[in-house]
Amino acid sequence: MKGHVTEIFNQLSTVYEKTVDKEGLYNTEYERPAMLNELPKDLSNKKILDAGCAAGWYTEQLIQRGATVVAIDISPEMVNATKRRVVGNVNVICMDLEAHMPFTDNTFDYIISSLTLHYLKDWKHTFQEIKRVLKPNGTLLFSVHHPFTDISWTKEKQYYSTELIIDNWNKDGKTYEVPFYRRPLQYIINTTSRYFLLEKIIEPQPTQTFKEYAPEKYEVLLKRPQFLIIKSTNSA
């Protein structure tokens, strides 16, 4: 699974640079505005970990807001894409979010993870590491697939399991088989609250620009949210 995810996102790195970061409505006009709305516009003197940086879109945005950013991703090609995007301005590391993080305790003011955690089967070790390297009262902000949408993929007879799903992404005339884990809402909420103080649960709404470009998909998102955003605090 892990090796397959790495290889798939190595292949997708160019696609992210050319299209997803500029034209992907579910990113540009749905998930990203809602995520950025939860962050201060001025992040000067703040140190932030971009956990699962992909091609570096969030990394660049955080730098523009004044933050000192460390970006990590499991895909070497995504790491290279991020380095091309933010030349010389950030430390970009190829590493697995399920491994020990090479940072000292209480390093970061914020940890941001955009649409990444659903590629991990078990969040416990990852959250233990995030809690360790996040400063007291620091913020963890992450987005994942919404379980209400993911349940439509299930091959199981019940909702409550954590299930490996294969999604087919059609990009630039090619189909990519992208594996992820579907999990119930209670897992997301309870696992997060075991390590952090829940501050806000956000079900993002698409922008009016999304509606202009894709009115039918816009209406679907108003009835069935695709992503879920969790904002929490590293309480003592």
Question: Which role does the model predict for each range below?
Answer:
Residues 1-43, 57-61, 78-81, 85, 139-168:
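Conserved class I S-adenosyl-L-methionine
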Residues 109-124:
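A short SAM/SAH-binding and catalytic strip from SAM-dependent methyltransferases
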